[in-house]
């Protein structure tokens, strides 16, 4: 009899993974241990699919790795990679489960070396900003009506054609001066700075445009030089910089008095359209016409009022002469009547007095003596009253506080202006005002003694 001796699996045997589970576990491990990182290499086997996704291999001299950049990310790249391009990609390490291949899921791509350029850009920006070159208070206003516009760019640049077309459309009356210079390549930064300095020295323009079209960071690098930035700041003419596209920023943009997103926008900012100027002038003319109309109306009313009051000089003189004669007549009449009445009354009194006088010499002498006595009494009374008045005046003068002060006394008042009459009304460290004959003094109370020792 044969027995079944096949061994049973031990309870501690490891679990068996499926291929899918294994790939999922490896994918999680890769994503957990390799965060978003920059990887450099050379482009190989590049394919742009109809879906918009990019597929390529990133390699160096010893190894290679597959990479994918999906359309949502690829649309923000500023260049189309080509075979052999040296690039840097910012990517996650992922696993493509169907084949079990690990690959890079690219979030961003740039040409090799751009990272170093960007670091240099940030360092120079921080340095110049610390020196105050980018201070908004330093920036000059762009003139509203520029008669002459200078342009610093390459004569062969497409940006120049865009600028000239815009200026011709918006402000054909504006004079344009070109200061030609290379805008990329070796030595171009020095030539750009020299062109800006030339425009500043000639002082021919009301505003200066420094422009070039779009390109890679290397193409625009001439506008990230310190010399160009310092020359823009030192320029005596307001400067508008329009370099690249709206998303491109250079050191020259920060140094300029005004940054334009594109060369065309720079031309639009520099030149106000003729139609806008005509509309503004027409509005100002309407305002002036309204003001003049109001002034003329007010002046006409004033003139009409004055004309009604105005008469000929001869008539005016005759009228005033009649007024004068009338006043003279009234004055004479007013003075004659009281005088006549007074003379008549005096004559009556004299007659009455003469009629009542006794016709004797003694009575006449008595009256004369009586009149003399009365006169003397009146004079004596007046003299006595004057003496009394003088005595009262002297007494009043003696009671004048100013006289008391002139004899060496002083008057003390507290903070409220109340006169201090007793020591108990004072407190130590209290501030009082001492009034003397010729002025006042602020005095602090050191101590108070209510009785004299």
Curated annotation (Swiss-Prot):
GO CC annotation, single: cytoplasm
S-S bonds: none
E.C. number: 3.1.11.6
Domain of life: Bacteria
Subcellular location: Cytoplasm
Main location class: cytoplasm
Gene Ontology biological-process entries: DNA catabolic process
Reactions this protein catalyses: Exonucleolytic cleavage in either 5'- to 3'- or 3'- to 5'-direction to yield nucleoside 5'-phosphates
Subunit structure: Heterooligomer composed of large and small subunits.
Similarity field: Belongs to the XseA family.
General function of this protein: Bidirectionally degrades single-stranded DNA into large acid-insoluble oligonucleotides, which are then degraded further into small acid-soluble oligonucleotides.
Name listed for the protein in its UniProt record: Exodeoxyribonuclease 7 large subunit
Biological classification of the source: Bacteria, Pseudomonadati, Pseudomonadota, Betaproteobacteria, Burkholderiales
Gene: xseA
